[in-house]
Curated annotation (Swiss-Prot):
Family affiliation: Belongs to the UPF0231 family.
Record NCBIfam families: PRK05248.1-3
Entry-linked InterPro entries: UPF0231
A Pfam family annotated for this UniProt entry: UPF0231
The protein's name in its UniProt record: UPF0231 protein PMI2039
HAMAP family found in the cross-reference section: UPF0231
């Protein structure tokens, strides 16, 4: 999973992710928006879920995060598409709507995102 964090023209924080993980970037940009307390809550919940049979969800306006003991899933709330309705030979492109990631990689990314926010706060 490749990603980068940068400041946009207005000084806000922008996350960009590689193909197959784009939904994570959209989720950070749309739902988290640099909220340190929310990042800390997610990291705490991940620690509680890891190695257990628990699951945890954070339902957002556009994207939602689901965590289990092995991986996370970020999914667009509007992702309800029946593939049976597609014409033969066609497929539905949903790479921008759903992404999966291992817990350790996701936690590392969140910690780097948190650090980037703290180092680049608007003065």
């Amino acid at each position: 999973m490749d990603y980068e964090f940068q400041r946009d023209l207005t000084g806000g924080i922008l996350a960009r992710f590689s193909m197959d993980h784009e939904a994570i970037g959209y989720w950070l940009n749309d739902e988290i928006q640099g909220d340190i307390s929310l990042i800390d809550q997610i990291l705490t919940e991940m620690d509680e879920v890891k190695g257990s049979e628990k699951q945890w969800q954070l339902i957002g306006k556009e994207y939602s995060l689901s965590i289990d003991d092995e991986e996370i899933m970020v999914r667009a709330n509007t992702l309800h598409f029946e593939t049976d309705d597609l014409e033969e030979g066609m497929s539905y492109y949903d790479n921008e709507s759903i992404a999966f990631c291992g817990l350790d990689d996701f936690a590392t990314m969140l910690q780097k995102y948190r650090l980037f926010i703290l180092e680049n706060r608007r003065s």
